[in-house]
Design a protein with these regions (language model features):
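Sec-exported extracytoplasmic/periplasmic mature domains
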Residues: 1-8, 134-141, 212, 216, ...
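Primarily marks secretory-pathway-exposed extracellular/lumenal segments that are disulfide-
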Residues: 223-274
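Propeptide-to-catalytic entry region of secreted or membrane-anchored zinc metalloproteases
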Residues: 1-73
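Pan-zinc metallopeptidase signature
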Residues: 196-226
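Stable alpha-helical elements in mature extracytoplasmic
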Residues: 124-128, 203, 210, 252
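Active-site-proximal segment of zinc-dependent metalloprotease catalytic domains
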Residues: 56-143
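The catalytic-center signature of Zn2+-dependent metalloproteases
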Residues: 119-197
Length: 274
């Protein structure tokens, strides 16, 4: 929903930015065909003795270190849901690093989806939205520096990241910030899930360019069709995983998504979770 601007809170975008709030024309669906050609739900569950995983080691992405190996990254978006240490909500590999054997997105299970054990204020699936944005070449909206550049001309310059749920307008001491202040409701800021509700047109352009340049294979297969010779695409807008445990060991989850290009320039990426 977030990438199609069909999210229920889209109307919360301030009126001054409604005209640049984008339908990114990117749909996500769980893969229904596995790498070996068999039917799949697009979700795998792996019981492991590893109690947590870290961004530094990236060990969730390898079966040899207690995680699970990815499905072929040129055909699937892999999302690992696990117990992520260090207070990190999630992380992603940018497309500029492609080809990368660790390509994909990792989300802490407490911040994934919107039901079950998910914890407020990150309980509406926006961690996945944010990290998939990075996976599709979006920078943080503050440009990761004081009054930095996020490479998108239609986002205001802002001094740093925002947290919580600021009141609009919330201004920064930056040239180019303007009377409307920070676009803190943008998915690429750090505000609470309930306060995020938009991508911009320039962010949309960057994401579609990233698909075409770095991830074109996602558009040229039938892995989210439910059939190896599909006549239609079966896509869903949301999903969640219940991170249970097995025999006292934490269970990690890997969701695999594929993609196809549909009429009207809509990009369907078969997603793992969100």
């Amino acid at each position: 929903a977030d990438f199609r601007r069909t999210n229920n809170d889209a109307s919360n975008t301030p009126s001054v930015w409604q005209n640049i709030a984008a339908d990114c024309e990117i749909d996500f669906c769980l893969a229904t065909v596995s790498p070996n050609g068999t039917a799949t739900t697009g979700i795998t569950r792996t019981s492991t003795s590893q109690t947590s995983f870290s961004i530094g080691s990236d060990n969730v992405k390898s079966s040899s270190s207690g995680g699970v190996d990815p499905w072929p990254q040129d055909d699937y978006l892999n999302i690992w849901v696990c117990d992520l240490s260090g207070g990190i909500l999630g992380y992603a590999t940018p497309p500029s690093s492609w080809p990368n054997p660790n390509d994909g997105v990792v989300i802490g299970y407490r911040y994934f989806g919107n039901t079950g054990v998910v914890q407020a204020p990150y309980n509406k699936g926006r961690t996945a939205t944010h990290e998939v944005g990075h996976w599709l070449n979006l920078d943080h909206i503050w440009g990761d520096s004081n009054c930095g550049n996020d490479q998108c001309n239609d986002t205001p310059v802002q001094q740093s990241s925002n947290y919580g749920c600021p009141n609009f307008p919330s201004t920064s001491n930056c040239t180019g910030n303007g009377s409307n202040g920070d676009m803190f409701m943008n998915y690429m800021d750090y505000t609470n899930d309930a306060c995020m509700n938009m991508f911009t047109n320039d962010q949309k352009s960057r994401m579609i360019a990233a698909i075409n340049q770095y991830r074109p294979n996602l558009l040229n297969h039938n892995l989210c069709s439910g059939s190896t010779n599909p006549t239609s695409w079966d896509c869903i807008g949301s999903g969640c995983v219940d991170p249970g445990t097995g025999n006292g060991a934490y269970s990690s989850y890997n969701a695999c998504f594929a993609a196809c290009e549909c009429s009207g320039n809509i990009y369907q990426l078969s997603e793992g979770f969100h």
